[in-house]
Amino acid sequence: MGRKDKRWVLQRKRDFYYKLAKKLKYRSRASFKLMQLNEKFNVIKPGKIVLDLGCAPGGWMQVAREIVGDKGFVIGIDLQPVKPFEYDNVVAIKGDFTLEENLNKIRELIPNDEKKVDVVISDASPNISGYWDIDHARSIDLVTTALQIATEMLKERGNFVAKVFYGDMIDDYVNLVKKYFEKVYITKPQASRKESAEVYVIAKRYTGKKWEEEDKIKRVKKVENEDNELLAKKIKEIRKLKSKK
């Protein structure tokens, strides 16, 4: 283990919410973020159906289940396997939520005839490169996909919560969300680390408007096999061109 890794482990052990999560048997310190967001914005209510995109290790699903209770239902999906829950009304699928075949699996699990959910939540993060321009662009890409899925899966007047890394593309993203929801907020819960660039977009009351393909935010597509430094330079060049227009 390198110095940075050791420092990260030590910092986490000193973290108040990390310790509290261990004590209360939550799977992640992120559980407290959703608690705080829901206390402030009341996006999840008892008896509702919740879809969690990028749910591993399951901390948000635990909190969602506590809120919806026995009469609600919580479905999660993640590329990583999620340890099964003790409740019958909490189910996690291993898979890529950007694939239509996996969305169809989710629809099969939704316990209503219209196959829609009341709330879509996402605490997902992109693969971190260490280059801020790339990581911000990838975060916008991921959260835009989450928004598109929300417009496909939500009941009318449903709610959406998603994490995004703050940066120069966030205003465009928030304006995009406003096309589909009546109320949109940006916030940072107390449980988020102060040094973290993460913020949360809270969108309430989905209008029912169908997703428009032209609403894909113009950005550099994720290129897994391309050198990160080269990709960062490309993003900066694109921004310079946009600023001159």
Swiss-Prot record:
Chain's role: Specifically methylates the uridine in position 2552 of 23S rRNA at the 2'-O position of the ribose in the fully assembled 50S ribosomal subunit.
Keyword terms, alphabetized: Cytoplasm, Methyltransferase, rRNA processing, S-adenosyl-L-methionine, Transferase
UniProt binding sites for S-adenosyl-L-methionine: G58, W60, D78, D96, D123
SUPFAM superfamilies in the cross-refs: S-adenosyl-L-methionine-dependent methyltransferases (SSF53335)
UniProt keyword annotation of Oxidoreductase present: no
Organism of provenance: Methanocaldococcus jannaschii (strain ATCC 43067 / DSM 2661 / JAL-1 / JCM 10045 / NBRC 100440)
E.C. designation(s): 2.1.1.166
Name of the gene this protein is made from: rlmE
Family the UniProt entry places it in: Belongs to the class I-like SAM-binding methyltransferase superfamily. RNA methyltransferase RlmE family.
Annotated compartments: Cytoplasm
Membrane-spanning residues: none
The protein, known as: Ribosomal RNA large subunit methyltransferase E
GO CC, one annotated term: cytoplasm
HAMAP family: RNA_methyltr_E
GO molecular function list: RNA methyltransferase activity; rRNA (uridine-2'-O-)-methyltransferase activity
Xref: InterPro entries: RNA_methyltr_RlmE, RNA_MeTrfase_FtsJ_dom, rRNA-MeTfrase_E, rRNA_MeTrfase_gammaproteobac, SAM-dependent_MTases_sf
Residues the record marks as active site: K163
Gene Ontology BP term (one): RNA methylation
Keyword S-adenosyl-L-methionine part of the UniProt annotation: yes
Superkingdom as given in the UniProt entry: Archaea
Catalysis: reaction(s): uridine(2552) in 23S rRNA + S-adenosyl-L-methionine = 2'-O-methyluridine(2552) in 23S rRNA + S-adenosyl-L-homocysteine + H(+)
Main localization, broad class: cytoplasm
Pfam families in the record: FtsJ
